[in-house]
Structures are given as C-alpha cells and as structure tokens.
A protein has these predicted regions:
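Short, well-ordered alpha-helix to beta-strand connector turns
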Residues: 56, 75-76
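N-terminal beta-loop-helix "entrance" segment that forms/cooperates
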Residues: 28-56
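Ser/Thr/Gly-rich flexible loops in soluble cytosolic domains mediating phosphotransfer, phosphorylation
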Residues: 3-4, 78-111
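Glycine/threonine-rich flexible loop motifs
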Residues: 70-73
Length: 111
C-alpha cells in the first residue's frame, strides 16, 4: 500500500514529529511505501505535491489542528484520527488504514 501520512499540531514539533516517526515505522515495518508531511504553526514549507498525494492508496491524517490544502486529497480514501489518539494507538491506526485500503482495493476489483 502507498500511504501518505499527514500530521498537524499547533506547534508542529513534538507531537507531530513523534507521531509521524512512529506511524512511518509501523507502516514500513509492515511493508508499506510511506511519504510523510508535518504541518504546524506556520510550517507549510514541506508540503507534499498533489501528484504524490494522488498516487497514494490511502491518506492518513493525525491532527490536532486543521490540515492545510486538503484539496490535494480529493477522491482519495482518507483516515482521520486525533493526534493524541494516534500516538497512543499506532498499530490500530495503521490497521485502520489497511482496512480502508482493503475496502477500496476490493471495490476497484469488483467495478
């Protein structure tokens, strides 16, 4: 699965970084391809381009604040989870992304 992980936190440092690293590790340990974007405060400089977001199978958003430029995810399956819950339940969050991927991949095969 190609996974884009977006973390957003008010300060954009501690929680975003910790959450992004843990989610990325869990997903790559399971064999998934992962791209990560961290947003927070005024940090919008490392945003992934729309092309990368559109090539993902699932967009995973761990948030404490609203995510900027959500139009990049249009038409993609999105899993949203509060960042504090994501940090405490890393495996379950990746499980959910895999579940959503399985549902969308299954519907594409049927259609």
């Amino acid at each position: 699965m190609k996974l884009v992980i977006i973390t957003s936190c008010v300060a954009g440092v501690a929680h975003s970084d910790m959450c992004a690293a843990a989610l990325k590790k869990e997903a790559t340990d399971r064999g998934h391809s992962v791209r990560v974007e961290m947003q927070g405060g005024s940090n919008l400089s490392d945003m992934l381009p729309k092309e990368i977001c559109q090539s993902a199978d699932v967009i995973l958003i761990a948030y404490a604040i609203a995510v900027a430029r959500k139009e990049r995810f249009e038409g993609k399956p999105v899993v949203k989870v509060p960042i504090d819950q994501a940090i405490r339940h890393i495996k379950q969050v990746i499980d959910k992304a895999e579940e959503v991927y399985g549902q969308t991949a299954g519907s594409e095969r049927k259609g």
